[in-house]
Amino acid sequence: MAMVRADADRESLGEGLLQERSQWLWSLPTAQPGAEDADDQLVLGEEELQDLEEEAVARHSFSQRIHSRATPLEVSPSGRLYQSIRHSRMEYSRPTMNIRSQIVSYSSSARPLPQQPAPSLTSWTPIAKHLHSHQQSISSQSPKLVRGASQRR
């Protein structure tokens, strides 16, 4: 019993930290063009696909913010700190089923973060399309990724 409780506490702590970092990074004012100490990249998007044959609709909305700023060398050997927050929400629905997926990730590094493409709705819908509505559905939580500045890939 204590083991389950510890895992639940750890999970809620991770969710809280992710939510806290996400809110903080999104609340930062955007860097002014030409500012030497900070740089911002913001990507927002939505897409929708309709399959008339299956009477299905797939929707995807995503947002990503990459923020970098100058920091003391004690904080980052490169003199900069790079932080990224990504949100992606997908939904596939047809008369007999509704599937939702959400991904939130936060990254922080002393090195520039690699550009990651947003998940593609066109690569996700074929998987959902081939599911049969009579299959038993199993509920599970989506994995959440929280990385600290000291972790390496």
Swiss-Prot record:
Location of the region described as Disordered in the Swiss-Prot/TrEMBL record: 107-153
Pfam families (alphabetical): Luteo_Vpg (PF01659)
InterPro entries reported in the protein's UniProt record: Luteo_VPG
Keywords, alphabetical: Transport, Viral movement protein
BP GO terms, sorted: transport of virus in host, cell to cell
Keyword Transport listed: yes
UniProt entry tagged with the keyword Transport: yes
Family according to the record: Belongs to the luteoviruses movement protein family.
Function: Transports viral genome to neighboring plant cells directly through plasmosdesmata, without any budding. The movement protein allows efficient cell to cell propagation, by bypassing the host cell wall barrier.
Protein name: Movement protein
Organism the protein comes from: Cereal yellow dwarf virus (isolate RPV) (BYDV)
